């Protein structure tokens, strides 16, 4: 209560443009939503998926696949992580996203976690989803982030799932809570109808999937997108589904897209013995080539040595698609990162220069706190929201995945607000980009198949 009062006072005396994290009482309240919804997510998700699969007449471990057109040869797709602020830090990427999506090789787009800030609500979808995506003509799929779950995923379902799956999911969620819900069935149907109206008005090809997770399978490549909810967990139905999809992808190049990353800010975030650690250990043992996730709002890369034919599990943290920048990585990178090969964007020098130039006087005590004692006793990352700059230069990014059976390779390329991001834009260590032209675009090229798979 006291925190909300303080936030209210600060809001009343500060001029706020766009989305602001520390000076937005709804965002403060979302902390309460997280505490309430977190433990319920697995039950909700399992009920939703079970009901939809039953309605479709499919076993749950054989449902929820999507099939974009044009994947019978070489193709590309975009992955945009944590986009949904609806302010300049999201909009600055719009022209580059549209330019890349306009390439005929790009067949679909995936939004990866936190589609709508601060609390995943329907009222924010037009500003934070449809307007920024206007002009995008390729199919759009998504996995939710923790913020999308704060309203029990109702708005995500209405906008990203097929209308039938959305209504079934929303009813199933209410059912598992014994009917304790703020929405009547008529209101659910009205929300779904409004989502259909907005998709039509803005020309967005969404509402194509039937669950908050899905897979895309071609003869050579598999994308398996999973939802790790609020607390980095998956229910039994989703876990069994993922295992079945991994089994179906044996012998293929497998990329897993998740809501939360294993490595972030130069640290292994998976505590040993936890379900979350078990998820990533499973990917390593199963021969997955690439793990990608968002949640932290920047770009990071880690090469994890693993046993098996590939020898490396490549981790991409791809969360720079629109939310405020996570400053902890560049300003508090550890001396001993968890993998020998690593990279992150923006560089420490570039971010420090912006902080020195753009930090207003009343925030200088926070900047001094970071520079002198690394924000002790909290972390630098804890203070990221204070530095939610809505002015250039921005350090947002997204990724393109180019799947080329004709060349036997998969290429991961990094894009920013002005086009290709270059090796000179990153801080990096180990073999990451070793010997690369500093002015060349950041790309990681991997073989589609390796001996022994």
Residue ranges and their predicted role:
Residues 1-102, 107-110, 148, 158-254, ...:
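Metal-dependent phosphoesterase/phosphodiesterase active-site architecture
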């Amino acid at each position: 209560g006291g925190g909300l009062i303080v936030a209210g006072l600060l809001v009343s005396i500060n001029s706020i443009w766009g989305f602001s994290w520390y000076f937005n009482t709804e965002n403060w309240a979302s902390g309460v939503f997280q505490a309430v919804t977190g433990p319920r997510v697995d039950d909700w998700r399992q009920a939703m998926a079970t009901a939809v699969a039953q309605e479709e007449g499919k076993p749950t471990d054989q449902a929820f696949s999507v099939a974009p057109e044009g994947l019978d040869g070489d193709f590309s797709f975009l992955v945009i992580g944590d986009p949904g602020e609806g302010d300049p830090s999201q909009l600055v990427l719009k022209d580059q996203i549209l330019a890349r999506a306009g390439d005929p090789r790009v067949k679909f787009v995936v939004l990866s976690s936190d589609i709508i800030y601060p609390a995943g609500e329907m009222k924010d979808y037009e500003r934070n989803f449809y307007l920024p995506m206007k002009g995008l003509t390729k199919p759009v799929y998504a996995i939710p982030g923790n913020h999308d779950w704060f309203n029990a995923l109702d708005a995500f379902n209405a906008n990203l799932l097929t209308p039938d799956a959305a209504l079934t999911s929303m009813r199933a969620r209410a059912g598992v809570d014994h009917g304790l819900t703020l929405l009547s069935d008529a209101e659910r149907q009205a929300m779904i109808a409004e989502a259909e109206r907005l998709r039509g008005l803005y020309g967005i090809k969404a509402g194509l999937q039937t669950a908050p997770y899905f897979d895309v399978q071609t003869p050579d490549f598999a994308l398996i997108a999973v939802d790790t909810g609020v607390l980095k967990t998956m229910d039994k139905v989703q876990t069994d589904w993922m295992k079945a999809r991994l089994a179906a992808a044996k012998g293929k190049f497998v990329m897993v897209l998740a809501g939360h990353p294993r490595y972030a800010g130069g640290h292994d975030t998976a505590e040993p013995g936890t379900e979350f650690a078990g998820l990533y250990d499973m990917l390593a043992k199963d021969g997955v080539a690439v793990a990608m996730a968002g949640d932290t709002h920047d770009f990071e890369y880690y090469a994890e040595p693993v046993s098996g034919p590939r020898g490396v599990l490549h981790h991409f943290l791809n969360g720079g698609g629109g939310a405020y920048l996570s400053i902890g990585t560049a300003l508090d990178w550890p001396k001993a990162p968890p993998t020998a090969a690593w990279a992150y964007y923006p560089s420490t020098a570039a971010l420090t220069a912006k902080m020195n130039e753009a930090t207003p006087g009343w925030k200088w005590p926070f900047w001094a706190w970071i520079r002198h004692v690394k924000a002790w006793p909290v972390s630098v990352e804890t203070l990221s929201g204070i530095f939610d700059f809505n002015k250039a230069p921005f350090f947002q990014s997204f990724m393109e995945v180019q799947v080329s059976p004709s060349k036997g390779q998969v290429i991961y390329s990094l894009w920013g607000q002005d086009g290709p991001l270059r090796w000179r834009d990153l801080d990096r260590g180990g073999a990451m980009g070793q010997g690369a032209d500093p002015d060349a675009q950041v790309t990681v090229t991997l073989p589609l198949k390796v001996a022994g798979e």
